[in-house]
């Protein structure tokens, strides 16, 4: 599902990005028509994988249905697709709201689905929602910082990239926002102390999202 969203996001009619993670984008190699079809095919493949690969003896069907509904919500007309629309529309929408929809929804869904599969309590699900949303937006803010620095160095290739934190607030304010989101995400994990070391990867992912490819000290 995430791969499908990235393929579509890179299209000329969207962010118009010829590369992704240092490699040519899907449409750059195979053409726009094939990239659209690839994204369209990957979305349902994700749902099929969930249904076919989740052990029925370990995960109740009711939990599985909640996972499918959650993912569908996060990528649909009130989630990621809404964020992309607002980004393309270019209206007065706040950059924070756009980033929450484009990136926060998927981060939230990823965290919540893990909770559903594990049988988490309702209050834990809400903490996971807030954690995942914070990490998703954090990832986007750091991406904006990296992209801005690449542009300064003569790189960066997202021609139609919409609003970003760095364009609206500048790099220093964007870094402050990233620090705020990192703290918020970790704060939500404070309610999971009873799980001990099993929650450590969630803390590590927050630091990874914050630290990758840039140093706060040289901002």
Model-predicted regions and their roles:
Residues 1-219:
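All-alpha prenyltransferase/terpene-synthase fold signal
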């Amino acid at each position: 599902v995430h791969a499908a969203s990235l393929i579509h996001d890179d299209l000329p009619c969207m962010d118009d990005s010829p590369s992704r993670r240092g490699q040519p984008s899907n449409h750059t190699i195979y053409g726009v028509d094939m990239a659209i079809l690839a994204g369209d095919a990957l979305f349902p493949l994700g749902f099929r994988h969930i249904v076919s690969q989740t052990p029925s003896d370990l995960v109740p069907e009711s939990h599985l249905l909640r996972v499918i509904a959650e993912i569908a919500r996060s990528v649909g007309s009130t989630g990621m697709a809404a964020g992309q629309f607002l980004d393309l529309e270019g209206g007065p929408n706040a950059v924070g709201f756009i980033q929450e929809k484009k990136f926060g929804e998927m981060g939230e869904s990823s965290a919540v689905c893990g909770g559903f599969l594990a049988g988490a309590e309702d209050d834990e699900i809400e903490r996971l929602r807030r954690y995942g949303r914070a990490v998703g937006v954090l990832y986007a803010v750091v991406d904006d910082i990296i992209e801005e620095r690449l542009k300064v160095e003569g790189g960066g290739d997202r021609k139609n990239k919409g609003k970003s934190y760095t364009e609206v607030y500048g790099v220093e304010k964007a870094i402050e926002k990233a620090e705020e989101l990192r703290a918020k995400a970790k704060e939500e994990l404070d309610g999971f102390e009873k799980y001990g070391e099993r929650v450590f990867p969630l803390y590590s992912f927050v630091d990874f999202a914050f630290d990758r490819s840039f140093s706060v000290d040289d901002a």
